[in-house]
Amino acid sequence: MTNPVFERIQSEIAANPVMLYMKGNAMFPQCGFSARVVQILTHIGVPFHTANVLEDPALRDGIKQFSNWPTVPQLYVAGELVGGCDIVTEMYQSGELAALLAEKNVAHEVSA
């Protein structure tokens, strides 16, 4: 039996090199953790798409099951889960996030 939420997530991740599942949207994040990841991605200058888990309870639960990761936000780069706010922040500060984007050939302004 197919899971329509998983299919949606797989489709969004496949269609968008940088996909962020978050509370709110890029213009109006609804939690501090989501806002921090948006701030980092914006500072790096990488185009990204978002999905607001607050608009769809099935998506909110489904993304956690899909990734086996208990929290939101969740950042995906080139189809792979990078992590949540703490991991993204650490990778940004160390230069690993820019290096990952370069390795995956994802256009961004800040180099490693």
Q: Model-found features: residue ranges?
A:
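Flexible, polar/low-complexity N-terminal or interdomain linker segments that lie immediately upstream
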Residues: 1-10
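Local sequence-structure signature of Cys/Sec-based thiol-disulfide redox active-site neighborhoods
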Residues: 10-47
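Thiol/disulfide oxidoreductase modules built on the thioredoxin-like
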Residues: 65-71
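Non-catalytic, surface beta->alpha helical segment in thiol-disulfide oxidoreductase systems
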Residues: 77-109
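TIR-domain catalytic/interaction hotspot
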Residues: 7, 60-65
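Thiol-based oxidoreductase modules, predominantly thioredoxin-like and allied folds used
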Residues: 42-60
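Acidic beta-strand-to-loop metal/phosphate-binding motif
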Residues: 21, 74-78
